Amino acid sequence: MGGRRMPLWALLLLWTSCSFSLPTDTASFGRILLKKMPSVREILEERGVDMTRISAEWGEFIKKSSFTNVTSPVVLTNYLDTQYYGEIGIGTPSQTFKVIFDTGSANLWVPSTKCGPLYTACEIHNLYDSSESSSYMENGTEFTIHYGSGKVKGFLSQDVVTVGGIIVTQTFGEVTELPLIPFMLAKFDGVLGMGFPAQAVDGVIPVFDHILSQRVLKEEVFSVYYSRESHLLGGEVVLGGSDPQHYQGNFHYVSISKAGSWQITMKGVSVGPATLLCEEGCMAVVDTGTSYISGPTSSLQLIMQALGVKEKRANNYVVNCSQVPTLPDISFYLGGRTYTLSNMDYVQKNPFRNDDLCILALQGLDIPPPTGPVWVLGATFIRKFYTEFDRHNNRIGFALAR
């Protein structure tokens, strides 16, 4: 018998049935491009604001804060120096927001159209409008998140959230009280916490945990790349893997030392050939929401003494830019390996300053026990070392960034 062509409708039916019987290996990646912005500190200095007072207030806040209240954790980041943000969508149809992807916290929040008239910082940001979303679900629970620069307050709501092309139903914060500093001048609207559930305020399940529960990712990891070149792509967050275009060699992993936090043990800090600190071990948090590297004030003083740096401006150590080429390397010992920053890695020039001073991206930060003392490895470190956060194996991987 001669072969008969199968009708188009039958082909479509066969294709549909086959497509639904494929193996469940449909895991993928989510990719969020990041933009680099001037920090709030840079903008304030450009406008002639005295940063000494603001930095002093931040220091007093840390001294007075209680770090033992697990139901309302204090986030160490103050966002004065944060420079990288990416876009997400909330609602149906999607409302777009610029957010910081912050491993130091675990909640998602954005400003609300219900923000009070006294909080003028809300006026310059994209505001979430629940009345414009057909997928909005009321919650109403009040929440407060304490940051280094103050606190944000509001209430919880539920809606669909789109991150890197992945859609989840998410409880998030609608902020109705937003501090003037830093948010009045911030280029970002809100914060998407990439921390653990234990870090979340009010027991809210974090966005990344909801994504993990859908089993759509190739691996239970996310990775962060921060560009060193301001005129290029600001950076990238990859959900479910890493991007070999932005790193070279292999990852080397360090196990998390504290459950429920992106905290690891650091076994030494060196200036040039001399190991000065942490030989017996120090706690260090890898924080994508922080710009600088920070550590106990006494430790930073030792480092600056070894560098020959004495001058401070508004809690920042500064040197004449002509001295930068003479500054030695600073190395951090993590997981049996040495991670070295050259002077070009840890010194930066504020484009808005008209003097010859360069800023060292190293700050003193005294966190009282039991949370501290702790070091914070922020964007200054991540720019040099592409970083992968592995939830499945509770570890952090570092590779040399391209």
Swiss-Prot record:
GO biological process: amyloid-beta metabolic process; angiotensin maturation; cell maturation; cellular response to xenobiotic stimulus; drinking behavior; hormone-mediated signaling pathway; juxtaglomerular apparatus development; kidney development
Enzyme Commission number(s) from the entry: 3.4.23.15
Regulation of this protein's activity per its record: Interaction with ATP6AP2 results in a 5-fold increased efficiency in angiotensinogen processing.
Keywords from the named record: Aspartyl protease, Cleavage on pair of basic residues, Disulfide bond, Glycoprotein, Hydrolase, Membrane, Protease, Secreted, Signal, Zymogen
Superkingdom classification of source: Eukaryota
Ligase listed as a keyword: no
Keyword Glycoprotein appears in the UniProt entry: yes
Residues bearing attached sugar chains per UniProt: 69, 139, 320
Localisation per UniProt entry: Secreted; Membrane
Family: Belongs to the peptidase A1 family.
Subunit structure: Interacts with ATP6AP2.
Name used for this protein in its record: Renin
Protein source organism: Rattus norvegicus
Species lineage: Eukaryota, Metazoa, Chordata, Craniata, Vertebrata
